[in-house]
Amino acid sequence: RMTLTKIAMTKRGRVALYADGAFVMSLHPDVFAASGISVGSQIDEDALRELSDAAELREARERALSMLSRQDYTARGLRDRLTRHVSEEAAGQAVERMQELGLIDDERYAARFAQELLERRHYGAARIRQELRRRGIDSQTAAAAASLEENDPQAHILAVLEKKYPQAAGD
């Protein structure tokens, strides 16, 4: 057990904890406030681990929100990106929370991405399925999105030909 001897704000707006005169860790102010600890509090390794886990989960959630504000991700894609900075467990919990909030929806992502691949790149259903699977969409969802998008194969073929041979489009 250690005794917290000092609590100070860092230049970056975090709360630095010192136990027995030595720096222990820094926390987000909200995580610190929720912990209920103060100078003179007795703290053990388990309590430090809990604080560290809570801080990491907060960081994972903040990173997830920041990433999702810039672009859409699949659940797997977001989890993969988050694990570069936080533990698998924290990344998984953050992804679950984003799904609960409706910020990640693999079916919605698949439908939108399939539409884009069809219209912009003129991909066929098989290639759309392949691209969706590569991004972490399950095979059933990928197949459903690809089949929705290729409802007129003849129009798709004409669009590809017009793009490849624009001079012949008038004939």
Annotate each PLM feature.
Residues R1-D171:
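An alpha-helical, amphipathic repeat domain used for nucleic-acid recognition
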